[in-house]
Design a protein with these regions (language model features):
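A cross-family "folded-core" feature that marks the main globular domain of proteins
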Residues: 1-184
């Protein structure tokens, strides 16, 4: 039988592992929010209650690293506490990791995910479905979208580098006309 202390100890190990896998400094609140989430998820599992994660597909597509870490956490919970959580719990845990990584609050994660999804769909539509989503270039594109979304959600001013250097802007407009139209 697992106790709150076991949940906290395991969460501490999981947060240490997550931190070792992510280059950014995570929000310190991850330990508390993840510990609470894990405790409640285990309690729900014992009561036979499972929640579907409506963002699972988007998390899978746009936050694969965080989802992989969420799956790792679910597996560690199964291995160390003998509790088999539903697959969607990996997505919920990923949302906590996204929140900690981007320093947003949990209420913003669904909106952030929707924004990244909408921008990626605009680009995919613009290029008529020809974006290769398995490439490093596409992964970098998603990273840029995530950080754009983070800055927007934090109401940070976006640096307008191109407007400060008309020569660069003119070069981009001429050399990368199609990409410029998509971004615009």
């Amino acid at each position: 039988r697992s106790s709150d202390l076991e949940h906290i100890q395991l969460t501490s190990e999981l947060v240490d592992y997550i931190s070792s896998q992510i280059s950014e400094i995570l929000n310190e609140s991850l330990m508390i929010s993840l510990s609470d989430h894990i405790s409640f998820a285990i309690e729900r599992q014992k009561q036979g209650i499972a929640f579907a994660n409506p963002l699972m597909d988007s998390i899978h597509d746009y936050f694969p690293e965080e989802l992989a870490l969420g799956r790792y956490c679910v597996e560690e919970i199964r291995r160390k506490l003998d509790v088999a959580l539903h697959e969607d719990e990996a997505g919920f845990i990923a949302m906590h990791i996204i929140n900690a990584r981007l320093h947003t609050n949990m209420g913003q994660v669904p909106d952030l995910t929707k924004l990244v999804n909408a921008c990626a769909e605009i680009a995919d539509t613009f290029y008529r479905g020809k974006l290769d989503k398995t490439t490093v270039a596409y992964e970098r594109f998603l990273v840029h979208l995530k950080y754009l979304a983070k800055r927007l959600f934090h109401s940070q001013e976006l640096p307008n580098v191109l407007s400060r250097d008309e020569e660069i802007l003119d070069f981009v407009r001429r050399k990368f006309q199609k990409h410029y139209r998509c971004a615009k």
